[in-house]
Design a protein with these regions (language model features):
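N-terminal helicase ATP-binding lobe
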Residues: 1-169
Length: 169
């Protein structure tokens, strides 16, 4: 809640049209956060028109639902890397860099890099192998390869998928 409230306070709404749209987005966000606290684990859908604030609303739902259901992480499964880049940037602006892992074919973290030289890159490289971060943003391919692969390197993420809020966008 703190991260989302701070982000809302920093957001500047200039025009009246933006204020109206942002008011609607805020209502969608508040409704999703409320439901995230109330609903038991299950399968849910969120249908909102384009530009209606699904990205932040789904994050609000997921955060509340993870806390209420004592889940360890949130995994976003998205079909296109361009959308992953965009959503991961939004999540980082709200939750901070250290809480969001972006994992797709266009992002490579080097585990051979000197740990002392670049601690953040080394930490992300390790987290990519087993998805050990609070929020993971990944492709459909990465997600299903982790479920169905016959190579241990691909299956290292499997245990961290359990007890997670998983969102298919």
């Amino acid at each position: 809640d703190n991260h989302i409230n701070q982000w809302l306070e920093k957001t500047d709404f200039k025009s009246d049209k933006q204020k109206i749209l942002c008011s609607i987005r805020n209502q969608v966000l508040q409704d999703c956060m409320s439901k995230g606290s109330e609903l038991p684990p299950g399968i849910y859908t969120l249908t909102v028109p384009t530009g209606g604030g699904k990205t932040t609303a789904s994050l609000g739902f997921a955060l509340r639902h993870a806390i209420q259901s004592k889940m360890k992480r949130i995994i976003y499964v998205i079909p296109y890397t361009s959308i992953i880049d965009q959503n991961a940037e939004v999540f980082r602006s709200i939750l901070g860099e250290k809480n969001v892992l972006e994992h797709h074919s266009g992002i490579l973290y080097d585990l051979t890099e000197d740990k002392a030289e670049n601690e953040a890159a080394y930490r992300k490289a390790l987290a990519t192998e087993n998805w050990d971060m609070p929020v993971i943003v990944t492709t459909v391919v990465q997600f299903f390869e982790s479920l169905y692969a016959n190579r241990s390197s691909k299956c290292r993420k499997l245990h961290n998928m359990a007890n997670s809020v998983i969102i298919f966008d």
